[in-house]
């Protein structure tokens, strides 16, 4: 019996003007996801996916490169304006926003959606180096 070959579908170009940039910036990495207004992903990138490893992954430069590559991929779908939501305490927050603006996307709003507990779970113990 002949095996079926897996054919990859060609990515369909959508024509989306406005979208949302979700920037998740942790102490170890920065992940940038560009979505339409409903939250369906158009493109994404991260510092780790670009080949930055170890402590270089958490730098503002790595976040800037991640935002640039995600923006270029999303602009192929016709993206022009963005609302930015930033989550997390990492170093790449501002760098990623600046990179999105420099790539030619118009940022209409910046929102901080970092989750803050109302005294929920006990945090991990402090590091002693």
Curated annotation (Swiss-Prot):
One of its GO terms (cellular component) is ribonucleoprotein complex. Pfam families: Ribosomal_S11. Keywords: Ribonucleoprotein, Ribosomal protein, RNA-binding, rRNA-binding. The keyword Glycoprotein does not apply. The keyword Ribonucleoprotein applies. GO terms for biological process: translation. GO terms for molecular function: rRNA binding; structural constituent of ribosome. Belongs to the universal ribosomal protein uS11 family. Part of the 30S ribosomal subunit. Interacts with proteins S7 and S18. Binds to IF-3. Located on the platform of the 30S subunit, it bridges several disparate RNA helices of the 16S rRNA. Forms part of the Shine-Dalgarno cleft in the 70S ribosome. PANTHER family: 40S RIBOSOMAL PROTEIN S14/30S RIBOSOMAL PROTEIN S11. This is Small ribosomal subunit protein uS11. The gene is rpsK.
């Amino acid at each position: 019996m002949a095996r079926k070959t897996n054919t990859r579908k060609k990515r369909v170009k959508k024509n989306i003007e406005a979208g949302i940039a979700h920037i998740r910036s942790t102490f170890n990495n920065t992940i940038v996801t560009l979505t339409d207004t409903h939250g369906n992903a158009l493109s994404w990138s991260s510092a780790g996916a670009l080949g930055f490893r170890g402590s270089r992954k958490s730098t503002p430069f790595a976040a800037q490169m991640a935002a640039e590559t995600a923006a270029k991929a999303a602009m192929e779908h016709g993206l022009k304006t963005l609302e930015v939501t930033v989550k997390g305490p990492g170093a790449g927050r501002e760098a990623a926003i600046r990179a999105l603006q420099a790539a030619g996307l118009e940022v209409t709003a910046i929102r901080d959606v970092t989750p803050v507990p109302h005294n929920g779970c006990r945090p991990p113990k402090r590091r002693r180096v």
